[in-house]
Amino acid sequence: MYYASTCMDHEIVEKKYKLGLNVTDNYKVRYNISLISQIFEGRCDYKNVVRLSLPKSLDLYKTGSNHYAYTLEVNMINVEKIYKLDNFEDVKELIDLGADINEAIKNIIIVNNIDSLKYLLEKGANIDLIDSYLAKMGNIDIFEFLFVKKCPMNKFLPIAVEYGHLNLVKFLVEKGVYVDFIDRTKYTFSEYTPLVAACSAGHIKIVEYLIEKGANYKSSYGVYLAAEKGHYDIVKFLIDKGTDLEKYGLRSLNEVIKKGHFDIMKLFINSGLEIDYDYYIYKAGLRGHTDIVKYLVMMQMSKQIQKI
């Protein structure tokens, strides 16, 4: 039996495979030869699993001595079954066929279904293996269940923040997740706190909430990322709150001038940041930002007049 994992819409997969289209031209797939136990290995967000019949005369190419993954340009002659991984009965059938429960529980599409999640845990799957990207689904009911089951919750906070799920963020913080938690298994950058993630993604309500709950904003890298990505409201909020611009102020200003974020540039200038006007006029001119050049020249002249 041949299996392929895919993220494509199952109806499109079924239609095009049955037409005999070349799978490698249309989809990113992974073939498993009689190894259903390995079907969930790899990505954590496969949406369906397709069971295919291939020509018997096909000469398969093995990609590695210890691997059972195959990539060939072949034409499908039939789609025997499509297992939708958000469907409990389909997941149960795959497990009954021999799919690895500890690989299955890593799939966020599967565990976002409460029945499938309960079934895997009943079968003995390791709850610690649930991928942190489950938080991008924002399903509070799932996380309430996981909390009761004593699943480690810290790793979900940065992802919930990144995807803008304020209610889930509140739930996690209220359940004791450290507001400045850094998931070092995914982020090697030592300052990528949930607040930094919220600033980068532009989620002002989450920024406000995290700071209210004690997140460190004074010397946060978040002001730089918010400035770089043009999130005016977040930059203004952080500056008004008194974030320390000594560490990231000039670096942020350099980025906003490079990208032409005029209004954000004014926030930094008006904050009292000491800058080299000649340098930034030159940088803005190189990028063709004439509005910024004019403003900086005006500010420079004003400063010079004040010194007279």
UniProtKB/Swiss-Prot annotation:
It comes from the Viruses. SMART domains: ANK. Keywords: ANK repeat, Repeat. Pfam families: Ank_2 (PF12796). ANK repeats lie at residues 100-129, 152-181, 190-217, 218-247, 249-277, 279-305. InterPro entries: Ankyrin-EF-hand (IPR052801), Ankyrin_rpt (IPR002110), Ankyrin_rpt-contain_sf (IPR036770). PANTHER family: ANKYRIN REPEAT AND EF-HAND DOMAIN-CONTAINING PROTEIN 1. This is Putative ankyrin repeat protein R835.
